[in-house]
Amino acid sequence: KLSHHDDHILYHVAIALKMGISVNHIYELSTIDPWFIEKIQNIVNVEEKLKHSELDASLLWEAKKMGFADKQIARAKDKTPDKIRDLRKNLGVIPSVKQIDTLAAEWPAVTNYLYLTYGGHSNDIVIPEDEKGIVVLGAGPYRIGSSVEFDWGTVNMVWGLQENGEKNVSVVNCNPETVSTDYDICTRL
């Protein structure tokens, strides 16, 4: 299966690594650059740690930085995602809010483009606790049957809320090609 690339190839690489097949042998069979295979090995190693180690803050940070969802951690520990989420929050393993530097550090950038990451321990912005606002969920990436018209619905929702006096309207979206992700559409993105 490693010599036939399809949409399952990364899973086959992970299975091969779990079986103890070396990175070099997987490379010979798959022609996938060893650098990528080693990255998959790192993920497999963390999964094994999750299965066989005590779940503490350090291991949760490591897993979250590697991109593990609470559901995946729960599966490895034979617990529910809610239990993992509660434990994670109680241990203070929560993502930080970071600003995207749209000017590549050439000049100070003050933007409303934000993202969540487990790769930091402090927030780039502080939102006052007494500040109220509304979050509008965007349509996400374009796909067949869902496109510009759904994004336009997001934009019109934001504009309508602003016209009705809402000062803090944030949009959550994961498609940088959309109008709803333009910097001047909402308070925070």
State where each predicted segment sits.
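ATP-dependent carboxylate/acyl-activation modules
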Residues: 1-189
